[in-house]
């Protein structure tokens, strides 16, 4: 009898691993992924529990780091020689590709955690040979150690590379804290093979929130859509993918033209001669991949992708040659030595330097996506303006590069270092600085009483506080209660926020605010942002008291109120929840199951599974559902902070059955068949999923209510303070 393990479905051999023969996900692929809620913990982090990266960075000699990086740019190594004797373009590409995974749809990706070091990003086809760039950086990282993270160093190297090639950057903000394991919470696409594009449907409709055209690419295929060399069709892909990275047409042109002012692509020979990516490479290669057997495998023989293109006459010096060449020549289609589509200038002289032979020159070459900057009418208009106004182009590229490399860092208050620009930009979601004396403990107590006396139901106060704070995304540090943007477009009009009810609550809170501020002395004021959160605190305390528990919900003032001028409506529109399981709200447009959407939102809010469980139980006890729906409100005492949700969910005297309404279930008495409660899939998953049921059982015991109330208050406070970076 063979001892080889076989997959029970396919009959194929399975591979044993430290996790077991088959993972649970292999056996049950539809199982929800709670693991994404428990990543990046102290168990994978080698730093001390009290390690403070911001404090360490402040001790760094940043000038010395920059000097070392500048020296590195021209210190060509035999094991991976520098094109044109300068590593600048390689480090620009490394930083660009680290940041360029960002997508505005869910805020995930980006350079903020150093994820390019790990799978899958370290082995994406589009990141070929960036492993060499990071190895070139190792001596600098080794020298300065924990004072600068890999995430910061990779972006800084890109900035220094640009500066070393004569370009003036807009600035640099540090503060990116390294993670120590691959991020399992990012959906990169449905494909199971590199460069596949199952993400499209209909008339090239790209699945949300994806922001690249194929699996393993950062943005678009440089040869054109699916390798078809059509610049106009490529422009459509470019516009869509860059927009999903929060870039408009002008920023897109600036980034492409600015980035392609430098360096070259590498398609010296047959790509079939390139070895496996880092994650598939043999152990003796020590994490390096793409080892090529074509010639020397490096230098003039390097193969990174397919095209072999050098865009400008001075590939290691800032210039306007990109636009000169784009518009001064006509272009004909050709193929690289690797067989990839590219374009060569007609009737042009040999004016482009060779990367390794000073005696050789080449004709200008371009990618299909470069010609999009000329063939697409909107891109062409911008390109010609930049061509005629080099200073405007330089400023646009500097700003777009800064945005590219900082878009996932959140507010400027998180930036570290002396190179942070003084100018605040609207995409940083600015809020005013505190310019008044904050309320004290006596004021807080008095305001709570006034808020509860407004006539607004406590549950509605809690819903408003939740709607304000739960927009936060830990992915790109956007959203949250600070700024009180719930009173502004677009948030005030979101369906999940029940605009008509919200307007009543805000009017009542604004009256309390106006009365307090008019009567306060000594420059003391309360912001509406603080008052919204305080209303939630008062509501939770009242609900706990109604259940027989005396609690104080922690509250720290210090939020301010943003203005319309500080709020980019289009940028904030992406924060609108398509679903919010905590409020039992399910909108349209997301094909995932409601429970999957709940887990996704919990992960964006940096919640653990126990925190998520406590919050669901508490919100249901409050009756805090959108539209006043009764689904999941398994209690005869709505508004009291009891553990009834868990007790009744787990009651084996009852059974659940699908209702006539899609997505709704009925809880019936097993003997009489009478319907007692209704629920959604979000509610039922806490009894269905074994891990969530185990958590529900903790709170559903006779002695579980006190622990539940304590844990709910802690989780609630965490949500209210997710964007309070000043408290960290």
Swiss-Prot record:
Its EC number is 1.11.1.21. Residues 1-20 are annotated as: Disordered. InterPro entries: Catalase_peroxidase (IPR000763), Haem_peroxidase (IPR002016), Haem_peroxidase_sf (IPR010255), Peroxidases_AS (IPR019794), Peroxidases_heam-ligand_BS (IPR019793). There is a cross-link at residues 219-245 (Tryptophyl-tyrosyl-methioninium (Tyr-Met) (with W-96)). It catalyses: H2O2 + AH2 = A + 2 H2O; 2 H2O2 = O2 + 2 H2O. Binds 1 heme b (iron(II)-protoporphyrin IX) group per dimer. GO terms for cellular component: cytosol. It comes from the Bacteria. Heme b binds at residue 260. Belongs to the peroxidase family. Peroxidase/catalase subfamily. NCBIfam families: cat_per_HPI, PRK15061.1. Homodimer or homotetramer. This is Catalase-peroxidase. It comes from Acidiphilium cryptum (strain JF-5). The gene is katG.
């Amino acid at each position: 009898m063979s001892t080889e393990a076989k997959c029970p479905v396919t009959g194929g051999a399975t591979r044993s691993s430290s996790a077991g023969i088959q993972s649970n996900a292999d056996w049950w692929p539809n199982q929800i992924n709670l693991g994404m809620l428990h990543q990046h913990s102290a168990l994978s982090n080698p730093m001390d529990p009290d390690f403070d990266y911001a404090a360490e960075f402040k001790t760094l000699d940043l000038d010395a780091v920059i000097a070392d990086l500048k020296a590195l740019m021209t210190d060509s190594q035999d094991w991976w020689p520098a094109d044109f004797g300068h590593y600048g373009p390689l480090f620009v590409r490394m930083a660009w590709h680290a940041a360029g995974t960002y997508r505005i749809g869910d805020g995930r990706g980006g350079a903020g955690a150093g994820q390019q070091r790990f799978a899958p990003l370290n082995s994406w086809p589009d990141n070929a040979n960036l492993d060499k760039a990071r190895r070139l950086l190792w001596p600098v990282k080794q020298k300065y150690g924990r004072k600068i993270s890999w995430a910061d160093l990779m972006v800084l190297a890109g900035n220094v590379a640009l500066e070393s090639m004569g370009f003036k950057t807009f600035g640099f903000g540090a503060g990116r804290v390294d993670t120590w394991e691959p991020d399992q919470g990012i959906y990169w696409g449905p494909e199971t093979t590199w460069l596949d594009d199952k993400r499209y449907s209909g008339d090239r409709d790209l699945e949300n929130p994806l922001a690249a055209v194929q699996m393993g690419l950062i943005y678009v295929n440089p040869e054109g859509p699916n390798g078809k060399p059509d610049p106009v069709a490529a422009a459509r892909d470019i516009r869509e993918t860059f927009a999903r990275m929060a870039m408009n047409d002008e920023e897109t042109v600036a980034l492409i033209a600015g980035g392609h002012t430098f360096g070259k692509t590498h398609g010296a020979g047959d790509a079939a001669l390139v070895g496996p990516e880092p994650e598939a490479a043999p152990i003796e290669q020590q994490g390096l991949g793409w080892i090529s057997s074509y010639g020397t495998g490096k230098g003039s023989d390097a193969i990174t992708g397919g095209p072999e293109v050098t865009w400008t006459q001075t590939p290691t010096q800032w210039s306007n040659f990109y636009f000169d060449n784009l518009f001064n020549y006509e272009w004909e289609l050709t193929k690289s030595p690797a067989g990839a589509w590219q374009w060569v200038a007609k009737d042009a002289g040999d004016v482009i330097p060779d990367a390794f032979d000073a005696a050789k020159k080449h004709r200008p070459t371009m990618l299909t996506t470069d010609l999009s900057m000329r063939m697409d009418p909107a891109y062409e208009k911008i390109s010609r303006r930049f061509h005629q106004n080099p200073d405007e182009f330089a400023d646009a590229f500097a700003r777009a590069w800064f945005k590219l490399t900082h878009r996932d860092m959140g507010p400027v208050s998180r930036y570290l270092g002396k190179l942070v620009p003084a100018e605040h930009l609207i995409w940083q979601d600015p809020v005013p600085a505190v310019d008044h004396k904050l309320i004290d403990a006596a004021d807080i107590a008095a305001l709570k009483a006034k808020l509860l006396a407004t006539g607004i139901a406590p549950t509605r106060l809690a819903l408003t506080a939740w709607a304000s704070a739960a927009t936060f995304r830990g992915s790109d540090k956007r959203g949250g209660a600070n700024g009180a943007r719930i009173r502004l477009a677009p948030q005030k009009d979101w369906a999940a926020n029940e605009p008509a009810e919200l307007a009543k609550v805000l009017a009542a809170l604004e009256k309390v605010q106006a009365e307090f501020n008019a009567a306060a002395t000594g420059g003391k004021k309360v912001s509406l942002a603080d008052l919204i959160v305080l209303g939630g605190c008062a509501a939770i305390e009242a609900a706990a008291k109604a259940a027989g528990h005396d609690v104080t919900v922690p509250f720290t003032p210090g939020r301010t109120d943003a203005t319309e001028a500080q709020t980019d409506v289009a940028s904030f529109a992406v924060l609108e929840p398509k679903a919010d399981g905590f409020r039992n709200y399910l909108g349209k447009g997301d094909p995932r199951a409601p429970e999957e959407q709940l887990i996704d939102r919990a992960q964006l809010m940096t919640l653990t599974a126990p925190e998520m469980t406590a919050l669901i139980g508490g919100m249901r006890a409050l009756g805090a559902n959108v539209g006043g729906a009764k689904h999941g409100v398994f209690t005869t005492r709505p508004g009291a902070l009891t553990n009834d949700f868990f007790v009744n969910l787990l009651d084996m005297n009852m059974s659940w059955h699908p209702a006539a309404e899609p997505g709704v279930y009925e809880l019936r008495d097993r003997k009489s068949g009478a319907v007692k409660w209704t629920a959604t899939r979000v509610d039922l998953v806490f009894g269905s999923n074994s891990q969530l049921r185990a958590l529900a059982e903790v709170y559903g015991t006779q002695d579980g209510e006190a622990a539940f109330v304590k844990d709910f208050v802690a989780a609630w406070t965490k949500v209210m303070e997710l964007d309070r970076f000043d408290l960290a």
